[in-house]
Amino acid sequence: MKTLSLFFTLVILISSCVSNLMAKHDSERKAPFSNHGMRLQHPPYLHFQSYRGHFIPEECTELCPQRCLRRHRLMVSCIPQHFCRCSSFQLSPPHIATSPKQYSKK
């Protein structure tokens, strides 16, 4: 009887830990990307742990070819000029405009 109660207590503790981890993971995926304290004015960013913990804009992953995403397990980066990169592949989406002041080099 004592073993049975310990088993149920352990199951309850494990399930609460798993639910907390899942909630934390969901909040990380919805967090916006911050570059040197600056908040970029873009749609919400997705967080793919398979790409070195970087944040990837949704529009970037949508524009990059699916074969590139599948082959490299979402190893896609999106630099400030909105170039989608996957290994040697590069795509410049013409319809995404950025402000010249926002990314001007000093």
From Swiss-Prot:
Residues 1-23 form the signal peptide. Transmembrane segments: none annotated. One of its GO terms (cellular component) is extracellular region. It is found in: Secreted. Its main location: secreted. It comes from the Eukaryota. The keyword Oxidoreductase does not apply. Disulfide bonds join 60-78, 64-84, 68-86. Keywords: Antimicrobial, Disulfide bond, Fungicide, Plant defense, Secreted, Signal. One of its GO terms (biological process) is killing of cells of another organism. Belongs to the DEFL family. This is Putative defensin-like protein 224. It comes from Arabidopsis thaliana. The lineage of its organism: Eukaryota, Viridiplantae, Streptophyta, Embryophyta, Tracheophyta.
